[in-house]
Amino acid sequence: MSRYRGPRFKKIRRLGALPGLTSKRPRSGSDLKNPLRSGKRSQYRIRLEEKQKLRFHYGLTERQLLRYVHIARKAKGSTGQVLLQLLEMRLDNILFRLGMASTIPGARQLVNHRHILVNGRIVDIPSYRCKPRDIITTKDKQRSKALIQNSIASAPREELPNHLTIDSFQYKGLVNQIIDSKWIGLKINELLVVEY
């Protein structure tokens, strides 16, 4: 199954807020999901919606998500927490969290078009897993810097997670450590995803 390219607001209305999917917001409260209309929700539906939230927020295919769950099960610690740490340490997500891109799909495009360097080397794989002490910069080309500058200028000033630091004048970001669970940007019950 390929990456989702359809209408994003339909997904937001059904699943709730997905900050990584789009930077736009619904105009009225009626655009968000209506809990009265949906009736009784089965356990299967609850688990499926949590999984879909994760998929659409991070822009993953079904196969990619299953691969991440498989890796998380093998690792030590809580499978759900390890899964979220793996997803949060992806290069496209880190660019989004640093404010270098307005959405995760926008960050994917920056990486695919070779505008991003990690530790001085071009990385064109959005799923690249960043490690502590990785330095993320842009190419020296004017076009690359202009794209990042526009994103940083237009991004709303949210509190930066403590595992990241950014120097907005040099267009440079630094991964300090692996993310702590309280800084994860999506409100989700990860245990339901693992159970699904």
Curated annotation (Swiss-Prot):
Annotated GO biological process: ribosomal small subunit biogenesis; translation
Keywords linked to the UniProt accession: Chloroplast, Plastid, Ribonucleoprotein, Ribosomal protein, RNA-binding, rRNA-binding
Segments of this protein annotated with the region Disordered: 15-41
One Pfam assignment: Ribosomal_S4
Any one GO MF annotation of this record: structural constituent of ribosome
Compartment annotation: Plastid, Chloroplast
CDD domains reported in the protein's UniProt record: S4
Main location: plastid
InterPro entries with a match to the protein in the record: Ribosomal_uS4, Ribosomal_uS4_bac-type, Ribosomal_uS4_CS, Ribosomal_uS4_N, S4_RNA-bd, S4_RNA-bd_sf
GO cellular component terms attached to this protein's record: chloroplast; small ribosomal subunit
Domain S4 RNA-binding stretches: 89-150
Organism domain of life: Eukaryota
HAMAP family referenced in this protein's UniProt entry, alphabetically: Ribosomal_uS4_B (MF_01306_B)
The protein's assembly and partners: Part of the 30S ribosomal subunit. Contacts protein S5. The interaction surface between S4 and S5 is involved in control of translational fidelity.
Family per similarity comment: Belongs to the universal ribosomal protein uS4 family.
Entry function: One of the primary rRNA binding proteins, it binds directly to 16S rRNA where it nucleates assembly of the body of the 30S subunit.
PANTHER family per the UniProt record, alphabetical: 30S 40S RIBOSOMAL PROTEIN, SMALL RIBOSOMAL SUBUNIT PROTEIN US4M
Protein name per the record: Small ribosomal subunit protein uS4c
Species annotation: Narcissus odorus
Lineage, top ranks: Eukaryota, Viridiplantae, Streptophyta, Embryophyta, Tracheophyta
Gene (UniProt): rps4
